[in-house]
């Protein structure tokens, strides 16, 4: 499978772009565990054009996480074009256009999934951005605005005609938000369309490597993107290593369009077997270290705490409430490290029934 100049092994797993989740520390760990492609948090085009520092900081990427995409969103054509040009200078391997975010503050203003109510504008933005940059441009969107407007089959053809290099489809409508079940049958229908010749990436409700394997088998997608199931669980990409799913070391980036050639063979993917709770705490501590080094102590801790709140490894620990509160209120690296080390000791002495 190939997106632009990026070649992947068979059945690659991608990390979905998620606000307040896919910071650099988390992306690097997902990459080490085998994510074939990672994405930054989504970036507001208008804020980027206005040089809002908190937005500009999201463009920070590392060669260790390649291939990496930067995702932008907005509803103004000129702002999206200018933002894409700014993003290109940051040196990602591709630019992704977000036409799928369902939250009110985005879709309610006509951006993200709001574009599903203004498809001519969506196509105009896509066409203009593709023409403005040299990098591959991809799109992430949903099945439609609601169940009465399931437009994805025709929309996929229209987006392909605009020149995009790949399309990611989340198997819900905007009206569903994240409720109900993702409908992969329509994703499979797009993939089977003989007119479609770009890679189709499926997304929605994948919680394990085994479920990803089933999606590949059943719907024939070119890649599977995993989102919420990765929260506090970057090792999900290292699970099911015998499933035939390709790992990050099996993909590479050719030196084209100003993008350096990166080898992933040096990235260590811990084994999925015998990967203990203590090992997983080591991963969370490593995430903390990277975030503090690459961002700063305050925001690095804030980003890491979000993953600590979501990680499944603390489920089932007796009398854990006060420890959780302390963990999520910690303000220094030393304080948070001490809490995690104390948890490690408790888990060693009193193992939980769940191994994360």
Which residues fall in each region the model found?
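Short glycine-enriched, charge-decorated loop/helix-capping segments at active-site entrances
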Residues: 110-116, 241
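Alpha/beta enzyme core
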Residues: 81-95, 99-111, 120-198
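Active-site beta-loop-alpha junctions enriched in small/polar residues
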Residues: 18-20, 43-45, 73-75, 100-102, ...
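Glycine-rich, positively charged N-terminal anion/phosphate-binding segment
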Residues: 2-4, 18-93
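Hydrophobic faces of well-ordered beta-strands that scaffold small-molecule active sites
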Residues: 13-16, 38-40, 68-72, 95, ...
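Alpha/beta catalytic cores of nucleotide-metabolism and tRNA/nucleoside-modifying enzymes
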Residues: 1-9, 13, 19, 24-25, ...
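N-terminal small/glycine-rich loop or linker at the start of catalytic domains
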Residues: 2-14, 46-68, 101, 106-109, ...
């Amino acid at each position: 499978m190939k997106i632009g100049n990026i070649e992947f092994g068979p059945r690659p797993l991608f990390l979905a772009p998620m606000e307040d989740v896919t910071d650099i520390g988390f992306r690097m760990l997902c990459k080490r565990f085998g994510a074939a492609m990672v994405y930054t948090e989504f970036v507001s085009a208008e804020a980027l054009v206005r040089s809002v520092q908190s937005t500009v900081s999201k463009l920070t990427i590392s060669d260790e996480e390649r291939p990496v995409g930067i995702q932008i969103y907005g509803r103004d054509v000129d702002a999206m074009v200018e933002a894409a040009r700014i993003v290109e200078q940051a040196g990602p391997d591709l630019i992704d256009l977000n036409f799928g975010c369902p939250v009110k503050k985005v879709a309610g203003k006509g951006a993200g999934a709001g574009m599903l109510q203004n498809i001519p504008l969506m196509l105009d933005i896509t066409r203009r951005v593709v023409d403005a940059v040299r990098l591959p441009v991809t799109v992430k969107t949903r099945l439609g605005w609601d169940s009465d407007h399931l437009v994805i089959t025709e929309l996929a053809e229209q987006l392909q005609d605009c020149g995009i290099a790949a399309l990611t489809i989340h198997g819900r409508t905007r009206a569903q938000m994240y409720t109900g079940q993702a409908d992969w049958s329509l994703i499979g229908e797009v993939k089977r369309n003989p007119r479609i010749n770009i890679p189709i990436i499926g997304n929605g409700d994948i919680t394990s490597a085994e479920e990803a394997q089933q999606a590949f088998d059943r719907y024939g997608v070119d890649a599977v993107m995993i989102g919420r199931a990765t929260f506090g669980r970057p090792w999900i990409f290292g699970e099911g290593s015998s499933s035939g799913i390709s790992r990050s070391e099996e993909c590479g980036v050719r030196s084209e369009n100003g993008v350096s050639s990166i080898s992933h063979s040096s990235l260590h993917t811990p084994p999925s077997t015998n990967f203990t709770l203590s090992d997983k705490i080591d991963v969370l501590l490593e995430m903390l270290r990277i975030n503090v080094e690459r961002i700063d102590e305050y925001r690095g801790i804030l980003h890491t705490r979000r993953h600590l709140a979501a990680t499944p490894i603390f489920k089932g620990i007796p009398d854990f409430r006060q420890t959780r509160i302390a963990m999520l209120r910690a303000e220094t690296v030393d304080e948070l490290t001490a809490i995690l080390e104390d948890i490690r000791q408790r888990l060693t002495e009193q193992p939980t029934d769940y191994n994360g």
